[in-house]
Amino acid sequence: MMDYIASHGLDIFTTVLGLVYILLEYRASIWLWLVGIIMPALDVWLYWSHGLYGDAGMAVYYTIAGIYGYAVWKYGKKHNQKEKEELPITYMKKSLYLPTLLFFLAAWGITYYILITFTNSTVPLQDSFTNALSFVGLWALARKYIEQWFFWIIVDAVCFYLYIVKGIPFKAGLYGLYVIIVVAGYFKWKKMMIKKS
């Protein structure tokens, strides 16, 4: 038992951080970004050691994006936002739909190419898909768009499967739980958005 725990120590620790992160995201707390810097920095090694090179690269991006997300939530502004008001939860502008889709498709294609050309990944299609959609999801989260939850339910469901296949059981369990929390998070943010308007 202790050997099992020792061999999955990083998986367990980052899973605990992941629970803290999703609960902070659910509450729309700016502190999610601090955890969102630490957890993915540790995940780089976890994913790399399990051959999930795309996810390792994504974890580097998450670490950097955590700094960006904090700055946007702390100092960012939206149209009609009052001075000193916290960045509000809003809908994504329809004019962003097509560029977002095109960015997702380009990121998926580029990441897929990198994985099949430069790594021995056994799941390049799924790994690149979750990476590309995570780029979009994290950007939408940083802008506090309510649609970010839709991106994450897809990412989390696919990652749940990937982590089971790759033998990362605690992360798999975390992502299974994320699927449930994401649904609740959407309704929580929607309620918060209505209350503020």
Which residues fall in each region the model found?
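Core segments of alpha-helical transmembrane spans in multipass integral membrane proteins
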Residues: L34, A59-I67, F129-A132
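Gly/Ser/Thr-rich helix-start
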Residues: L19, I37, L52, I67
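Polytopic alpha-helical membrane-helix bundles and their juxtamembrane interface segments
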Residues: M1-A28, L32, M39, G76-Q81, ...
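A broadly tuned "polar low-complexity/structure-edge" signature
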Residues: I37-P40, W45-Y47, K74
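Membrane-water interface of transmembrane alpha-helices
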Residues: Y61-N80
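Helix-loop junctions on the outward
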Residues: A28-W31, D43-Y61
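Short, flexible micro-motifs
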Residues: M39, G54-G57, G69-V72, F170
